[in-house]
């Protein structure tokens, strides 16, 4: 795990471990309900060429008898040999987690990555743990910081019950929906960026800082969409979409204890833009 810790921020590494600990809880309970597509399915098998979009994904943490749960079912892989000049990918994940860190020279790219959680809340050593609690709470704080008129723009008129651009959707682009960030107040825009940082900030601080500057520069072309209740504790989906980012948060088929999220850059998943230079 030292390699994973070196690639991520302290908060990102903590989140990863909380997701894995949750999977141990799920294992102790005999597994769980499997609404929607399973998490962790973005991690591809090691290929013979680093840098570009890897081959088709395999199921997350699977094995004989189907999906396997628990800490022992998480794996570290390298696509290509670590090099200061040749692109390579560090991958870590299993059920409900897929971390892809593409390294191109001094640049690190975290997209696509899929942090998920089941259970969404559990108790460990007397402490209540919510691996994706901040993602949930900050999303609800943002939608409730919007005025009634702004909410009419942001809230979709249909239900979204799963990730739209989850595993297997590499390279796909969808029409932006919801409310433009340019129509938000400065404080609302700051809240939007703070939500996005929950995903961006998984990566080491230097790379995350550069990425946040990029997202801030693209705010005028960034959209925020919401589907579901605006009351925290009830089911809701949300999406942040801009020229270089797609973030989705989705309780699976209405199950608040089974959360999937996705973090993508449609222009640079697996470092494609950097590799092409």
Feature-to-residue mapping (PLM):
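A cross-kingdom marker for long, charged
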Residues: 2-277
């Amino acid at each position: 795990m030292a390699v994973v810790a070196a690639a991520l921020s302290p908060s990102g590494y903590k989140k990863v471990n909380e997701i894995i600990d949750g999977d141990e809880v799920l294992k102790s309970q005999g597994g769980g309900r499997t609404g929607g597509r399973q998490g962790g399915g973005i991690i591809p098998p090691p290929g013979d060429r680093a840098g570009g979009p890897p081959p088709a994904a395999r199921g997350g943490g699977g094995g004989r008898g189907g999906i396997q749960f628990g800490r022992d079912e998480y794996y570290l892989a390298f696509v290509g040999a670590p090099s200061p000049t040749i692109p390579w990918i560090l991958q870590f994940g299993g059920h409900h987690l897929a971390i892809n860190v593409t390294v191109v020279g001094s640049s690190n790219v975290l997209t696509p990555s899929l942090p998920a959680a089941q259970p969404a809340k559990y108790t460990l050593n007397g402490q209540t743990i919510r691996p994706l609690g901040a993602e949930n709470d900050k999303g609800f704080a943002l939608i409730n910081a919007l005025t009634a008129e702004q909410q009419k723009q942001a809230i979709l008129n249909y239900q979204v019950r799963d990730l739209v651009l989850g595993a297997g959707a590499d390279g796909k682009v969808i029409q932006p929906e919801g409310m433009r960030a340019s129509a938000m107040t400065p404080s609302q825009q700051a809240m939007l960026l703070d939500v996005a940082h929950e995903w961006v900030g998984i990566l080491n601080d230097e790379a995350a800082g550069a990425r946040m500057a990029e997202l801030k520069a693209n705010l005028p072309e960034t959209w925020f969409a919401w589907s579901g209740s605006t009351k925290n504790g009830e089911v809701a989906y949300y999406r942040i979409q801009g020229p270089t980012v797609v973030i989705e948060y989705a309780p699976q088929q209405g199950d608040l204890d089974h959360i999937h999220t996705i973090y993508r850059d449609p222009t640079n998943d697996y470092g494609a833009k950097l590799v092409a230079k």
